[in-house]
Amino acid sequence: MMKLKQLQHGTTTVEFALIGFLFFLVLLAVLEMGRLMFTWNILAESTRRTARLASVCPIDHGDIPIVGNFNRPGSSGDNNFIVRMNEANLDIDYLDSQGDETSTFTDIDFVRVRVVNYEYGTIIPGLSISLSAPTFTTTLPVESLGFIPDTGTFECFGSAS
């Protein structure tokens, strides 16, 4: 009986280590999945915000992708919510009634904004995976494009451009 008890010394420690490893692996996977869903939501919201701004601001206004990316007008840099997302990842297209790109003010009927070249990186230690974001696209009909009929000027964010 004494010999059997000596052979089982340390089995609890090994079992705890295996179960602990699996528990933390599942915990990190759940956290990473939540972070991925949050990132996808922010990407979709960025396209929606940018398309909304592009439909009511002049087509040459440089702050549209900056503000659509959750930053202040005139600033630049990464999105305040997710890393490696900046205004260069937002592609703004002005479309005519047929869906073709145009830059003629009177022909613009729609605004399309897409997320391009965004790479999602995991934060799990020792597991560095990079995922390309799916295509997030928002298309909205144009509104004023910043034109104020009473004054004949173009304005956005409270300032004339």
Show which residues each predicted segment covers.
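Alpha-helical assembly-interface signal, strongest on the long, hydrophobic N-terminal helix that forms
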Residues: 2-70
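Short, conserved structural patches
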Residues: 52-161
